[in-house]
């Protein structure tokens, strides 16, 4: 029993709203869900909060590729995410989005408090700019060689190989991840968060025990290197929140993403009159706040986030808990091997509680990678859950229903029950400290004891003897009571199984009732609770995951979609007069959905052309550009005016159209030949 009720807010890192959830992601949500369910089982007030991380350039570009508005895309992805989580029995108290009114208000509030406190600095910087896409490149959209360890193909903000953080301008041989072009430097004004001003506070917070030792050690290295001011600005075009006092400037996604924890909780408070936002987030809050994250985002959660909260007058989290990555069969998740498994692919083939248990059995409080060995997975689930746990009930419940009117006997010898109850505090401590693997080992050791008791007593033999009926009744009742205790211990890990067992035993499984006397209690007829994992199901998952990759790796080529036309003679081609033209003016055409009106300078002569490129270009983006036109096309009278030629463009249409642009040095009027 919980000695006193705690107020707890727990979060998982926000999944990014540009793609599906996979089994690597699921480790964190399963870990957090188990911990939150345990706190609730112990009688504490615990709120598990999450949201989709819905801002940033990747989402903007993905939406463009799909010819969707970003808002439409993130709503669709959020629906898919929530269904995957629900089917994995992840029990959020609230799942929201960072693209919300609550988050916008809180992000603005925190920014303005930091600005007014003198923690926001403004300066002009030189930033990498994609000359082909006419956009500044976020850190993650520049790739190159790490300046520290020389690992190739690293992102512009940190190195996956050595963990170093740096500016994208520090990369060796940088390339735009959007177009592949070599970026150029361009000046822009940005706002910076003064992280070094919080160094003393962060050092003290690190020493307070709020972080795992591995995290604290890593922070020590970062302190030695010296903290840097943090760029919190992104230039348009960008999908996110505009900075209140800076039109055309947007908050970097990593500023408003962690604020999404607060935004989601604020949304929950708005739905419930019994919750007070300030009780959890005010500076003097006595509630507990915990963040579960992956080891790849430690820097943001252990430095920027607590410093932002401190500077804006909010409380800091009690602890930040990091976990490692998921490997499959001892190697990095691989699409080519079929081990990059989406949550939905798994759910289509296997019970989600199998994975919940397997992850729990291998999780500890350390930041270690966890290997999902698929053969071991099948063996462990079949041995522990089917062979030990469920088998305990399946071997004894039938006798209670058929021979003893479905009622449990009072057990004369309570020594086994006392042994099981004596482990409650140790198991609770393992859950509390996130040593789930140790908890599972304790529980399965008890299951072994219970199964040995049943095997030795052999109730299937006792029921055959007239004078052994009471003994058989007691053995089966004892076994089912031990089964009840085991499933109660496992309830945070296996909530659906626990629900089914509650229906079978016709009682609620609670930690406070572990020692409850069940003599005379009536149970329902036993129904199968779990099936064995068959390797054919695992093979189907691998096949489906590999098949998905093959489809992705072999799209139809442009030539498949648009075959080359029939041959023409050179004389036919020579009739075309292709010329370089400068777009002197571009403007919208009233009442025309697809056309822009272009004035094309041929170096002494101007031609007017109506071009069907409105879906891909704004007029202001075209003016001054060089392009290629068919100069000797017969004029065509249109209802908007006379069109005196044609500009050349490539692409299937809509947003995917690109006008041809000659290399530097070409001049208006030059013939293309």
Swiss-Prot record:
The gene is metG. GO terms for biological process: methionyl-tRNA aminoacylation. CDD domains: Anticodon_Ia_Met, MetRS_core, tRNA_bind_EcMetRS_like. Pfam families: Anticodon_3, tRNA-synt_1g, tRNA_bind. It comes from Shewanella loihica (strain ATCC BAA-1088 / PV-4). Zn(2+) binds at residues 146, 149, 159, 162. Residues 572-673 form the tRNA-binding domain. This is Methionine--tRNA ligase. InterPro entries: aa-tRNA-synth_I_CS, Anticodon_Met, Met-tRNA-synth_bsu_C, Met-tRNA_ligase_1, Met-tRNA_synth, Methionyl/Leucyl_tRNA_Synth, MetRS_core, MetRS_Zn. A motif ('KMSKS' region) lies at residues 332-336. Its EC number is 6.1.1.10. It is found in: Cytoplasm. NCBIfam families: metG, metG_C_term, PRK00133.1. Homodimer.
């Amino acid at each position: 029993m919980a000695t006193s009720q705690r107020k707890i807010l727990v979060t998982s890192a926000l999944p990014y709203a540009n793609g599906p959830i996979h089994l690597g992601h699921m480790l964190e949500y399963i870990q957090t869900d188990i911990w939150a369910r345990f706190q609730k089982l112990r009688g504490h007030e615990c709120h598990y909060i999450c949201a989709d991380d819905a801002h940033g350039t990747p989402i903007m570009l993905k939406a463009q590729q799909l010819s969707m508005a970003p808002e439409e895309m993130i709503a669709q992805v959020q629906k898919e995410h929530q269904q995957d989580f629900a089917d994995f029995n992840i029990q959020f108290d609230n799942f929201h989005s960072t693209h919300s009114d609550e988050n916008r208000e809180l992000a603005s509030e925190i920014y303005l408090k930091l600005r007014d406190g003198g923690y926001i600095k403004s300066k002009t910087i030189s930033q990498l700019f994609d000359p082909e896409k006419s956009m500044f490149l976020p850190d993650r959209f520049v790739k190159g060689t790490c300046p520290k360890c020389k690992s190739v193909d690293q992102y512009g903000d940190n190195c996956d190989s050595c963990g170093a953080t740096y500016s994208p301008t520090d990369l060796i041989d940088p390339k735009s991840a959007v177009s592949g072009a070599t970026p150029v430097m361009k000046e822009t004004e940005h706002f910076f968060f003064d992280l070094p001003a919080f160094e003393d506070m962060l050092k003290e917070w690190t020493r307070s025990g709020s972080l795992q030792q591995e995290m604290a050690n890593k922070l020590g290295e970062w302190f030695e290197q010296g903290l840097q001011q943090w760029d919190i600005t992104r230039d348009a075009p960008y999908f996110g929140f505009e900075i209140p006092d800076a039109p055309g400037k947007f908050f970097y996604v990593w500023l408003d993403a962690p604020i999404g924890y607060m935004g989601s909780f604020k949304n929950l408070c708005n739905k419930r009159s019994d919750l007070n936002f300030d009780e959890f987030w005010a500076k003097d809050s006595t509630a507990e706040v915990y963040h579960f994250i992956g080891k790849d985002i430690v820097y943001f959660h252990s430095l920027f986030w607590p410093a932002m909260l401190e500077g804006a007058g909010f409380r800091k989290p009690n602890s930040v808990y990091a976990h490692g990555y998921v490997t499959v069969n001892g190697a990095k998740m691989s699409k080519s091997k079929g081990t990059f498994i989406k949550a939905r692919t798994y759910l289509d083939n296997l019970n989600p509680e199998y994975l919940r248990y397997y992850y729990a059995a291998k999780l500890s409080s350390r930041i270690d990678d966890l290997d999902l060995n698929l053969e071991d997975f099948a063996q462990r689930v079949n041995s522990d859950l089917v062979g030990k746990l469920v088998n305990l009930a399946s071997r004894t419940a039938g006798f209670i229903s058929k021979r003893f009117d479905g009622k449990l006997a009072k057990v004369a010898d309570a020594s086994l029950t006392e042994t099981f109850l004596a482990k409650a505090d140790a198991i609770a401590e393992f859950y509390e400290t996130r040593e789930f693997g140790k908890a599972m080992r304790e529980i399965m050791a008890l299951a072994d004891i219970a199964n040995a008791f049943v095997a030795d007593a052999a109730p299937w033999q006792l029921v055959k003897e007239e004078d052994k009926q009471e003994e058989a009744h007691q053995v089966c009742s004892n076994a089912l009571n031990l089964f009840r205790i085991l499933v109660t211990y496992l309830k945070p890990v296996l909530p659906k199984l626990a629900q089914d067992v509650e229906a079978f035993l016709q009682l609620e499984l609670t930690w406070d009732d572990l020692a409850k006397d069940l003599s005379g209690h009536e149970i329902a007829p036993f129904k199968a609770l779990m099936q064995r994992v068959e390797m054919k199901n695992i093979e189907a998952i691998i096949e489906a995951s590999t098949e998905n990759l093959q489809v992705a790796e072999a799209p139809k080529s442009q030539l498949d979609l648009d075959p080359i036309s029939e041959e023409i003679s050179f004389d036919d081609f020579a009739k075309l007069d292709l010329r370089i033209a400068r777009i002197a003016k571009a403007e919208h055409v009233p009442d025309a959905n697809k056309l822009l009106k272009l004035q094309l300078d041929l170096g002494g002569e101007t031609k007017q052309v109506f071009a069907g490129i409105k879906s891909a270009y704004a007029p202001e983006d075209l003016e001054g550009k060089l392009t290629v036109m068919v100069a000797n096309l017969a004029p065509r009278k249109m209802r908007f005016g006379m069109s005196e030629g044609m500009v050349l463009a490539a692409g299937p249409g809509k947003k995917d159209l690109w006008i041809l642009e000659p290399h530097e040095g070409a001049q208006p009027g030059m013939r293309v030949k």
